[in-house]
Curated annotation (Swiss-Prot):
InterPro entries: Dup_hybrid_motif, Glu_permease_IIB, PTrfase_EIIB_Cys, PTS_EIIA_1_perm, PTS_EIIC, PTS_EIIC_1, PTS_IIB_1, PTS_IIBC_sucr. The keyword Transmembrane applies. The chain crosses the membrane at residues 109-129, 158-178, 182-202, 204-224, 226-246, 264-284, 303-323, 345-365, 404-424, 444-464. GO terms for molecular function: kinase activity; protein-N(PI)-phosphohistidine-sucrose phosphotransferase system transporter activity; protein-phosphocysteine-trehalose phosphotransferase system transporter activity. GO terms for cellular component: plasma membrane. This is PTS system sucrose-specific EIIBCA component. NCBIfam families: EIIB_glc, PTBA, PTS-II-BC-sucr. Residues 510-614 form the PTS EIIA type-1 domain. Keywords: Cell membrane, Kinase, Membrane, Phosphotransferase system, Sugar transport, Transferase, Transmembrane, Transmembrane helix, Transport. The active site is at C25, H562. The gene is scrA. Its EC number is 2.7.1.211.
Length: 651
């Protein structure tokens, strides 16, 4: 690679004066761009030395690769006259450049609160769906499964009990998560949640009927009649209570010192919050919550299939804005009161939108002749059909525009069909082709037919339009000039550099590593702080941040060991190293250490990636079928190509 020329091509594509700040990590240039609309994305996509680009958190990242990215960066700095900065510095520059949006901040808060408890709600929801399958009549036969096989009655009742728990005790889950997000003690938040669902209180689901019947029980507090009402299945009151609790706790921590703080702050916070919960905050927010729920149900009932069609048409656009982050809170409220609401109309529509986007992306896969595009659309399309739409929407459909439009139209038509048959979900789950498991049993056939409509209506016009407009879009890649260096690799077994749980690179929460753009290999969730050499070789790359190592093995493999995700931002904190560039190492030699606990405490993912960066030189790179692995144990098998083809290959 000619690093000067690569830097020139990058600057030509981006604009020499269009870069506000630049840094690099082990594999990528990290840039803050003044105006991203001026970037010649096609030039970067066609550049053989650029392995990929993406934008995240205000940074435009260009994937170059270990051993080269630092040299390209140096050339870029010289050519632009920019000041060298660290990834941590550029993170601050990017954050400062992003306009604060109160609405997006609010959505982020909701997302932070609900995402941690979603697994519990999904588990309860799917168990509820299973119970529906066992107890619903006219699903498989005239009678229910339990009626035909009475021996299953006990199992169904047990499943129903387990399914009800996350929704009945929702205030405990929400109290913990919300109080933590608001900066308070989450265990005090859970305690307030327990107080709100005490068995001695009137059950939250029966409060309205109990009051209407004149049977509500009251406390007499300083002459006030305070209803002994529970808050089972409530969302908004718990969020309000958690905010007050966290605010009071921080106030008392500030004004009460020493041992008195430890003793009295929790008590004062709970007593005051509890009093406000049952006298003012709880009743008011319950009324608001009930009004919102009734309003949504009324809107659904009054607009019918037309409203569902419009919602389906706009759903993917809502995802782009981020407003969909409010939906978990709304759905939780609808599902927690399923006896009154009948279920949620949001989940079925989300499923139609995701299926439509996936179908449109797969249509591009079958229409394009570009191998690069095929690689992207195949994985993105399947992911969308399974409920993960970001790669399809942002990576393919929005860039090409017409697939997104056809997918939105398909979603609107399919959602209107859902509205005609009053299809509702009774559980949370994957909004995808397998979403039928969360649908009310009587509506499963209508849901499946709607899914087919969404797929077909999105796929066919996208495919036809793509065939007419894409033409011959085969990759036009400029091959880098060859050198006289002959590739010489041999079969080799690469050992694990750390102890931990082995997993596929595709499971890593990073779009570069998970897409195997840098090469194939393996990931390890570490349980030991020591990092050892995975094979005999020479250290080719080290970093001041000590978060990654490059090794050229004696058998020809080029290995990148990357410790954690985005850990370059730590500038070496929590890392030590025993080697430097040019050192000869033997398999098992200690390369360095990293503090796993400190990384987790700082909210960094400590997953270790072992990447074979010259994967293209091998016939096969395979992660061995292991789960837990000790440092030094076999992890990745490399198979060299036939000797004749190796000798003839140059780079």
């Amino acid at each position: 690679m000619n690093h000067q020329e690569v830097a020139d091509r990058v600057l030509n594509a981006i604009g020499k004066n269009n870069i506000q700040a630049a840094a690099h990590c082990a594999t990528r240039l990290r840039l803050v761009i003044k105006d991203e609309s001026k970037i010649d994305q096609q030039a970067l996509d066609d550049d053989a030395d650029v392995k990929g680009t993406f934008e995240t958190n205000g940074q435009y990242q260009i994937i170059i690769g270990p051993g080269d990215v630092d040299k390209v960066y140096d050339a870029l700095i010289v050519k632009t006259g920019l000041k060298e900065v660290t990834p941590d510095d550029i993170k601050a520059v990017a954050a400062a450049g992003q306009n604060k949006n109160p609405l997006m901040d609010f959505l982020k808060v909701l997302s932070d609160i609900f995402i941690p408890i979603v697994p519990a709600l999904v588990a309860g929801g799917l168990l509820m769906a299973l119970n529906n399958v066992l107890t619903a009549e006219h699903l498989f036969m005239a009678k229910s499964v339990v009626e035909v096989y009475p021996g299953l009655k006990g199992i169904a009742e047990m499943i129903n009990a387990m399914a009800s728990a996350p929704f009945t005790f929702l205030p405990i889950l929400l109290g913990f998560s919300a109080t933590k997000r608001f900066g308070g003690n989450p265990y005090l938040g859970a305690t307030m949640g327990m107080i709100m669902v005490l068995p001695s209180l009137v059950n939250g689901y029966s409060v309205a009927t109990t009051m209407a019947a004149g049977k509500m029980v009251y406390w007499n507090v300083f002459g006030l009649h305070v209803a002994q009402a529970g808050y089972q299945g409530q969302v908004l009151p718990v969020l309000g209570v958690a905010f007050i609790l966290a605010t009071l706790e921080k106030f008392f921590h500030k004004h009460i010192k020493g041992a008195f703080d430890f003793t009295f702050t929790p008590m004062f916070a709970i007593v005051i919050t509890g009093f406000l919960t049952f006298t003012i905050v709880g009743p008011v927010l319950r009324t608001v919550s009930d009004a919102l729920t009734n309003g949504l149900v009324g809107l659904y009932n009054s607009t019918g299939w037309i409203g569902m069609g419009i919602f389906g048409l706009l759903y993917s656009a809502i995802v782009i804005t981020g407003l969909h982050q409010t939906f978990p809170a709304i759905e939780t409220q609808l599902l927690a009161n399923v006896a009154k609401t009948g279920g949620s109309f949001i989940f079925p529509v989300a499923s139609m939108a995701n299926i439509g986007q996936g179908a449109a992306t797969l249509a591009i896969f079958f229409a394009t002749k570009s191998q690069k595009q095929k690689a992207l659309t195949s994985s993105a399309g399947v992911s969308a059909l399974l409920g993960i739409t970001e790669p399809a929407i942002f990576g393919v459909n929005l860039k090409m525009k017409f697939p997104f439009v056809f997918a939105a139209i398909a979603s609107g038509i399919a959602s209107a069909f859902l509205g005609l048959f009053h299809v509702l979900s009774v559980a949370m789950g994957p909004a995808s082709v397998i979403g039928f498991i969360s649908i009310a049993s009587k509506s499963i056939p209508a849901f499946m037919l709607s899914a087919v409509i969404s797929f077909v209506v999105a796929f066919i016009p996208t495919f036809i339009y793509a065939k007419r407009t894409l033409g011959d879009d085969r990759d036009q890649v400029k091959s880098p000039a060859p050198t006289s260096t002959v590739i010489n690799v041999n079969d080799e077994i690469i050992s694990a550099p750390v102890t931990g749980a082995s997993e596929s690179l595709k499971q890593v929460n990073d779009q570069v590593f998970s897409a195997e753009i840098m090469g194939k290999g393996a990931a390890i969730v570490p349980s030991s702080d020591q990092v050892v050499a995975p094979a005999d070789g020479v250290i080719t790359v080290t970093y001041d941040s000590h978060h990654a190592y490059g090794i050229k093995t004696t058998a020809g493999a080029e290995i990148l060991i990357h410790l954690g995700l985005d850990t370059v931002n730590l500038n070496g904190e929590h890392f030590t190293t025993n080697v430097q560039k040019g050192d000869t190492v033997h398999q098992g030699d200690l390369l360095g250490t990293f503090d796993i606990a400190a990384l987790k405490a700082a909210n960094y993912d400590p997953t270790v990636m072992l990447i074979v960066t010259n994967t293209a030189n091998y016939a096969n790179v395979e992660r061995l079928k292991v789960t837990n692995v000790q440092a030094g144990e076999q992890l990745v098998a490399l198979t060299a190509p036939a000797a004749s083809s190796v000798a003839a290959t140059t780079v």
